């Protein structure tokens, strides 16, 4: 992830980084190593750090056991990704001096995919130099991020049938599922491999981490309708019109006021705040799912025992 001062610099840097398959898989690709890339972007006064650092497809910790093995020296920050949070990342000792960012990427224009994660940063003014100074000085006041279990690579799972599997059993079976699909290591297990502590050790500068989930998905679960249907999108828009933002609805607005607008949604918001919503962990490329019963706890218990349960 590169934070760039302005559009002109972005164009210059893009031309320098251009490669034959730059649009492969919807992501820019480059021939440069992490260390070379770091040195290059510094010439343009940019900030750089690994995006979704722990994810199994393209994350930095997929290929390296240390951030210094990738970049040669310390980058400016670590972006955690949807499938991890501060509590997971702060079990890795080498990350204690890095500011954490939560900046979700977007693969569609739907509101529930935009701005799923963001940072609260104290700025002197609305400028790149102020943003740079805040990140360098670790003046991040809060990270807002998806509940990690909802991330589509949180748990080790098959990329074809999406069943969860014990990572050690997956290794024994050469990461092959009985359905013929490939098992992809989850962020949860990858962090356990490189972790130095059983419990997180937060440095003094580490800000609070506020867990979120997309409001449209809560509405979808309550009304048992697809998240992009007119029903769900209409209910979502009505709440936004009345309260302003998803954060105000999920975190700040009173349950009583929400109930006046949509009495069916207010219990779901209350359950979210009380952490009583049940989550099917995501894995293998499939997002986690939310429910208001325990129907998915059995699935996890069964699939984490043996490969024969797939």
Regions found by a protein language model. Name each.
Residues 97-113:
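Short acidic/histidine-rich active-site segments
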Residues 45, 96-97:
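Residue-level detector of structured alpha->beta connecting loops
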């Amino acid at each position: 992830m590169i934070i760039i001062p302005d559009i002109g610099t972005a164009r210059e840097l893009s031309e320098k980084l251009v490669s034959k398959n730059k649009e492969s898989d919807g992501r820019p690709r480059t021939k440069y190593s992490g260390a070379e890339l770091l040195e290059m972007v510094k010439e343009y006064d940019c900030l750089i750090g690994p995006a979704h650092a722990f994810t199994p497809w393209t994350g930095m910790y997929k290929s390296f056991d240390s951030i210094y093995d990738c970049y040669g020296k310390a980058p400016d920050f670590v972006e955690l990704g949807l499938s991890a949070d501060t509590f997971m990342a702060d079990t890795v000792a080498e990350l204690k001096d890095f500011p954490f960012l939560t900046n979700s990427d977007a693969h569609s224009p739907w509101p529930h995919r935009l701005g799923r994660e963001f940072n609260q940063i104290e700025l002197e003014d609305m400028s790149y130099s102020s943003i740079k100074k805040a990140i360098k000085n670790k003046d991040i006041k809060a990270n807002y991020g998806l509940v990690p279990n909802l991330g589509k690579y949180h748990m080790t799972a098959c990329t074809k049938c999406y069943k969860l599997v014990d990572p050690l059993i997956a290794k024994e079976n050469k990461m092959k599922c009985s359905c013929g699909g490939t098992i992809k290591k989850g962020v949860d297990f990858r962090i356990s491999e490189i972790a130095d502590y059983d419990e997180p050790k937060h440095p003094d500068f580490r800000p609070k981490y506020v867990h979120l989930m997309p409001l449209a998905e809560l509405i979808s679960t309550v009304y048992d309708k697809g998240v992009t249907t007119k029903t769900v999108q209409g209910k979502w828009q009505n709440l936004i019109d009345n309260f302003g933002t998803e954060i105000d609805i999920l975190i700040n607005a009173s349950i009583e006021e929400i109930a006046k607008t949509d009495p069916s949604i207010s219990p779901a918001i209350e359950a979210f705040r009380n952490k009583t919503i049940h989550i099917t962990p995501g894995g293998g490329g499939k997002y986690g799912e939310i429910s208001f019963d325990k129907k998915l706890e059995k699935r996890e218990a069964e699939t984490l025992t043996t490969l024969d349960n797939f």
